[in-house]
């Protein structure tokens, strides 16, 4: 019996430490490869799986979204259990649902939210090793929040992209929300936008940490931003503090 092909939408989280990013890279361990291998075991054939965000090596996710089209073989709750059975423990599917087969986790997304974790204390909490960037010197988080407001709205983010040798076709993005929040020694940076350039969030964090440490003024950051050129005034924050927190879709695709 031929089963109708439907779309499947998955929401998943993963610890990025043991992966070379999301995207398949030959035989290297990647999240996409792990997910496609799990799907192939269930359907007994190779099926491509698409991700909303192509996270880099070492970057984590709390709310990555993936999609694929396949014959309707399992109900969503059964599919979720089957995928988690086949996936490594560092990848978990939290939600599975049936959507139109044309649904694209990547191209139908209207915004993404990333979170970056900083541990601001002379002594690093060992439980946050590989999960947060250790900044031993005290930071002025209020000043960092003031500088972060420069990013709000529609701007050219060419100064915050790291893509050696690759021209950026359209460096304009709209940042919808951008702020720091302190909880004890933990400092959270949340940023929501309609899209992100390569390493854009990590470059933003790298620059804002320099502001917080008094090594870069808000005016200097504003000048770098307006010049629209990547310079060596700041280094990108390391990947292990970054999390893909959530992906948003049009209301009719959220059900």
From Swiss-Prot:
The active site is at 56 (nucleophile). SUPFAM superfamilies: Pseudouridine synthase. One of its GO terms (molecular function) is RNA binding. Its EC number is 5.4.99.12. It holds the Pfam family PseudoU_synth_1. It catalyses: uridine(38/39/40) in tRNA = pseudouridine(38/39/40) in tRNA. Keywords: Isomerase, tRNA processing. CDD domains: PseudoU_synth_EcTruA. Substrate binds at residue 114. GO terms for biological process: tRNA pseudouridine synthesis. It comes from the Bacteria. Homodimer. HAMAP family: TruA. Formation of pseudouridine at positions 38, 39 and 40 in the anticodon stem and loop of transfer RNAs. This is tRNA pseudouridine synthase A. It comes from Methylacidiphilum infernorum (isolate V4) (Methylokorus infernorum (strain V4)). The lineage of its organism: Bacteria, Pseudomonadati, Verrucomicrobiota, Methylacidiphilae, Methylacidiphilales. The gene is truA.
């Amino acid at each position: 019996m031929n089963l109708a092909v439907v779309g499947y939408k998955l929401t998943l989280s993963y610890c990025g430490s043991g992966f070379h990013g999301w995207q398949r890279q030959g035989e290297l361990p990647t999240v996409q490869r792990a997910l496609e291998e799990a799907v192939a075991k269930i359907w007994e054939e190779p099926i491509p799986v698409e991700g909303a965000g192509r996270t880099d090596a070492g970057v984590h996710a709390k709310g990555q979204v993936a999609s694929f089209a396949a014959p309707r073989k399992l109900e969503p709750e059964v599919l979720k259990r089957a995928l988690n059975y086949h996936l490594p423990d560092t990848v978990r599917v939290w939600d599975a649902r049936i959507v139109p087969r044309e649904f694209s986790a990547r191209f139908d997304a209207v915004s993404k939210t990333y979170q970056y974790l900083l541990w601001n204390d002379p002594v690093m909490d060992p439980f946050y090793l590989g999960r947060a960037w250790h900044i031993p010197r005290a930071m002025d988080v209020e000043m960092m929040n003031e500088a972060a407001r420069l990013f709000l709205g529609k701007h050219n983010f060419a100064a915050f992209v790291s893509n050696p040798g690759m021209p950026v076709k359209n460096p304009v993005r709209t940042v919808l929300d951008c702020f720091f929040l302190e909880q004890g020694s933990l400092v959270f940076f949340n940023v929501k936008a309609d899209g992100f350039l390569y390493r854009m969030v990590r470059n933003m964090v790298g620059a804002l940490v320099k502001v917080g440490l008094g090594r870069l003024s808000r005016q200097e950051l504003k000048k770098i931003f307006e010049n629209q050129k990547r310079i060596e005034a700041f280094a990108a924050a390391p990947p292990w503090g970054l999390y893909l927190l959530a992906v948003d879709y049009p209301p009719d695709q959220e059900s």
